[in-house]
Amino acid sequence: MTVNSKRIPFGKPMLEAFCMDPEYTNLNSSSCGSWPKVVSKQIRDYWSLLEAQPDLFSEFSQGLVLQEARIGLAHLVHAAVSECVLVSNVTTGIFTVLYNQAFEERDVVVTLSTTYGAIDHGITSLAETRPFKTRRVEFELPTTGQKIVSQFETAMAQIRADGLRPRLAILETIVSIPAVRMPFEDLLRVCQKEGIMTLVDGAHSVGQFEVNLQELQPDFFVSDCHKWLFVPRPCAVLYVAERNQHMMRSVIPTSFGFIPKNGNSRLPLWSQMVSASETASSFETLFAYTATSDYMPHLCIPAALRFRRDVCGGEAAIYEYIKWLAKEGGDKIADILQTEVLEEPGLGAGVDGQMRNCGIVTVRLPLAIATGPSTAPAHVPGGALTEKEVGPAVRYLTKALAERYKTWIPIIDYRGWIWARLCAQVYLEVSDFEMAGNSLKVICEEILNREMGQ
């Protein structure tokens, strides 16, 4: 099969086009992702070319393909090519942006209670040596997008009342876990109205739903490509609006593209970066080379985009299918477990909430935690788990899923319950979610019967 083959139907037929063990059910695209066999062949071919003539490939061929990759990604996210550069992952992209900010004492970096842990740690680390403060907007799920926006506005007003300036807000498109789609479009509009710069963590965005940066107009945006775009890991795209590119003084680590304030960038005379820099902006040149790095995943972006177009039927078809499958599959699991899906409270029958407008779904398991808030019922069949039992229960559950059912599902304890996150994908179908639901039911019953040690 080549990328020019006719379209393959979604579901089980599509699985044959991917590299996974047919006995393995990948319900966790939002962590490691997956890629087709043609992309796997592409990366091996590039490795062979690199090893056959290392310097010639690096200097003359690699840059051309990387430029093609940037052009493809820019078209995908509706942005100028000059605003899109390649980085290894979202964490690197976000920290690079933060590292380049000239913070002042009264500046505040705003995060949400759902901000990804690695980003939280990075901000805390940077705050130890930089003159800025942090504030977190607290809220609990489930809730509504309207309430999140309202709490955000209230928090911004309080920051200003304290004599501080909300300088930069880190917003998410989709919360990692428990996974829901955030009202990031509305939050962006609030920030733009109030003059707050925005850094959008779109880790789970590109390849899962349409991203239109021309319409959204964030200051900074970064998304992994290896989660949903069928690109080998690690690979991500960093968008910096042209109006903000003067802020980006250095990559991490600082390399040849750096331009000192009192001089010019000193590129090696023999490097193809010299000729490239004649047409590229200083921002593009800055990211053209960052020490000795593995660019192989980035080189596969064009092949992945062709596969999505020619074999999958295009981006719109992919988005529609995985959104539908996450909805149907999540509802199926909740029905099997007699629980619920995480979404806005109080939705009427047949009403789709915005928080499920994506290809990921979070389902509550029938495992309550005794010390949880009042959201947990007074009685759960088998008895609620004690705090000491939660860790062993989660480990037992994930190990049983892996060993018995050949799958992996991220599990989290949240607000007095245990929850599971599942991802739809083009090679999955409702029967895969049904399998997951039945498997979770069996294992949860074992946990409630305290059979974990048997």
From Swiss-Prot:
GO molecular function terms noted in the UniProt entry? lyase activity
Q: Does the keyword Lyase apply?
A: yes
Induction per UniProt is:
Expression is induced in loline alkaloid-producing cultures as well as in planta.
Q: Please describe how this protein is used in biotechnology or industry, per its UniProt record.
A: Loline alkaloids show broad-spectrum anti-insect activity, and different lolines may have different biological activities. In vitro tests of NFL, NAL, NML, and semisynthetic loline derivatives with long carbon-chain acylations on the 1-amine have shown that many are effective against both fall armyworm larvae and European corn borer larvae, but the effects seem to differ depending on the modifications. N-Formylloline reduces the weight gain of fall armyworms by deterring feeding, and does not significantly affect corn borers.
Which key words tag this protein in UniProt?
A: Alkaloid metabolism, Lyase, Pyridoxal phosphate
Kindly give the SUPFAM superfamilies that the UniProt entry links to this protein: PLP-dependent transferases
> Which InterPro entries does its entry note?
Aminotrans_V_dom (IPR000192), PyrdxlP-dep_Trfase (IPR015424), PyrdxlP-dep_Trfase_major (IPR015421), PyrdxlP-dep_Trfase_small (IPR015422)
GO biological process assignments: alkaloid metabolic process
Enzyme kind, highest EC tier: lyase
Q: Needs which cofactor?
A: pyridoxal 5'-phosphate
EC number, as in UniProt:
4.4.1.-
Pathway(s) it belongs to: Alkaloid biosynthesis
Q: What PANTHER family does UniProt report for this protein, alphabetically?
A: HERCYNYLCYSTEINE SULFOXIDE LYASE, L-CYSTEINE DESULFHYDRASE
Biological role stated in the UniProt entry: L-cysteine desulfhydrase-like protein; part of the gene cluster that mediates the biosynthesis of loline alkaloids, potent insecticidal agents composed of a pyrrolizidine ring system and an uncommon ether bridge linking carbons 2 and 7. Lolines are structurally differentiated by the various modifications of the L-amino group and include norloline, loline, N-methylloline, N-acetylloline, N-acetylnorloline, and N-formylloline.
Could you tell me what this protein is called?
Answer: L-cysteine desulfhydrase-like protein lolT1
- Please tell me the species this chain comes from: Epichloe uncinata (Endophyte fungus)
Give the organism's phylogenetic lineage: Eukaryota, Fungi, Dikarya, Ascomycota, Pezizomycotina
